[in-house]
Amino acid sequence: MKYDGDGRATARFFSDKGCRRAPLFTAPADAARHKRCLWSVSRVRRARDGRFYRSRLVSVTVYASPSPFSDERPSSRFRGITLLSKRRRLRYSTVGLTRYRKR
């Protein structure tokens, strides 16, 4: 995922032509609202034709912590630990390990 100036990972819907990365999107109101946000997790869903796309509706936002490594995006293996609810841990643990395939 690419990052905008805020350091927030922008996950937007992909175009119909395969799984190409969407261009960055920055809005002043969006940047002000997510000023403290470091990275956001969005669920990778699989479409009917076999393509992957990220939905922005179920995105978990992780905010800044006083940790010295808080400016970096944590690795995908620690992503389940960062989430608050234990019920969602298994569902979001493999986000980021999925490669986007072009059909």
Swiss-Prot record:
Keywords: Plasmid
Superkingdom field: Bacteria
Name used for this protein in its record: Uncharacterized protein YubC
Organism: Shigella flexneri
